[in-house]
Amino acid sequence: MENDHSSSDEHEHENPELQTRAPKRRRLSETSEDDEYVAAPTPLPTLSRIKKKEPKDENKDTSTGTDNPVLIKDALEMGLQDAGESSFKALNVAPWLIGSLTTMAVRKPTAIQRACIPEILKGRDCIGGSRTGSGKTIAFAVPILQKWAEDPFGIFAVVLTPTRELALQIYEQFKAISAPQSMKPVLITGGTDMRPQALALSQRPHVVIATPGRLADHIQTSGEDTVRGLKRVRMVVLDEADRLLAPGPGSMLPDVETCLSALPPSSERQTLLFTATVTPEVRALKSMPRASTKPPVFVTEIEAGGTTSAGADGAAPKSTLPPTLKQTYLKVPMTHREAFLHVLLSTDGNAGKPAIIFCNHTKTADLLERLLRRLAHRVTSLHSLLPQSERSSNLARFRASAARILVATDVASRGLDIPSVALVVNYDVPRNPDDYVHRVGRTARAGRRGEAVTLVGQRDVQLVLAIEERVGRQMEEWSEEGVSVEGRVVRTGVLKEVGSAKREALIEIEEGRDVLGRKRNKLKKVR
């Protein structure tokens, strides 16, 4: 490259024809000296050559790495690695995919991507566990697209995920990564008309991203012609596998089994499971009987420090939270929880932060949105009782910062990647510690800083202790310099203001009006 640069300079000085042509391009200038000085402007490629030339000339000075002062600890926390496979090229990713990822500003693979992509490309089944925000979607999307490009046909892959919003996010990522190719993904989720979805399935898209309930409906009711293409699927992904495979009330297992029954047997397809919490149900799949022709399952669990535990059969690692997350709690009386929340969101430190408030029940989320709206907060909501069109528009408003606060149930706790979120508030303490891990994972993503505040009542102490045992870290008591939440609630008119707003919100709900005061029919849950 250095020789090319020097030779181009010599050619420019030695070629008289080039020197005589250059002034003709700059007839706007009237002085010959100016023309001579700017006759050969430096093109962009020359700038890049100069940058590449510097390390060769100053090799001894730059060997210490002072140009990129990244500490080893910080690099591990970000899922980066200076030595070994620190690029997608080293993982044998196709050049067109590397270019597509670069366009998306994804230049270095994270720990879960480094561990899984080469093994998936080898054809191995995979169980991947890694903390939230670590790039699990790219870890399975890239090898799927690379293998599809080698033999594109019909429905190549099916991705199952528990929520509509996460399915939409995965669908958009597949479209973005596959932009240079003519890959056709299709989104199959509840809350929308089944007829266009059935038509799309019958036209043999390349990748199907679906929620289990809606895809099971199509398998059972849309006819053989619609789902015949599923019989040739090569790859299956269970994203948020712990939720998809969880037993008990509200389990998705029956729908997942219906979906898998329409696909080729496990011996004839590649199965990928990804989750932030590797549960016993997920880990047990490693020991299931396998065809002798298939390679062993690849199991990896990436801890928060970037270390890899491959093939582990013990308990799930506790360090599943990002190191940049600050965990705090705020003691609140059960009768004044709304007032404490209002003051917490209004402090100088929190007033400008995009925040997600998690509730255990849809009715609580609905009430909180109405109450906070009356208290002058820019707020929207996301829960299962809303029509799908409203869920999508509310989430879009929050992504675009038209609303600062999103009040949500656990439908928003998994997979949603909204980098601007700086604060997560657990209005209700989750009953399952794994749900806490997913909730607080909505902030402090990809190395950014974030805070999670849990409102703790008298009856929540045991739940908090279980959470601390699960994550291996203790929560600190919330504090902000010069702020006493309890003092502001007691000594100001907050209690009266919040009480009045709550009464108005309850009346609005009883009258069957939406958050804008418009009369509407009772909401029905759509599968």
UniProtKB/Swiss-Prot annotation:
Motif (Q motif): 86-114
Domain called Helicase C-terminal: residue spans: 324-486
Chain intervals with Basic and acidic residues compositional bias: 1-16
GO cellular component, one term: cytosol
Domain of life: Eukaryota
Disordered: annotated segments: 1-70
UniProt xrefs under InterPro entries: DEAD/DEAH_box_helicase_dom, DEAD_box_RNA_helicase, Helicase_ATP-bd, Helicase_C-like, P-loop_NTPase, RNA-helicase_DEAD-box_CS, RNA_helicase_DEAD_Q_motif
Residues the record lists as binding ATP: 130-137
Motif DEAD box: chain residues: 239-242
Keyword Ligase: no
Keyword Transmembrane (UniProt): no
Pfam families in alphabetical order: DEAD, Helicase_C
Catalyses which reaction(s): ATP + H2O = ADP + phosphate + H(+)
Gene Ontology molecular function: ATP binding; ATP hydrolysis activity; RNA binding; RNA helicase activity
Domain description: The Q motif is unique to and characteristic of the DEAD box family of RNA helicases and controls ATP binding and hydrolysis.
Protein name: ATP-dependent RNA helicase dbp8
Top-level taxonomy: Eukaryota, Fungi, Dikarya, Ascomycota, Pezizomycotina
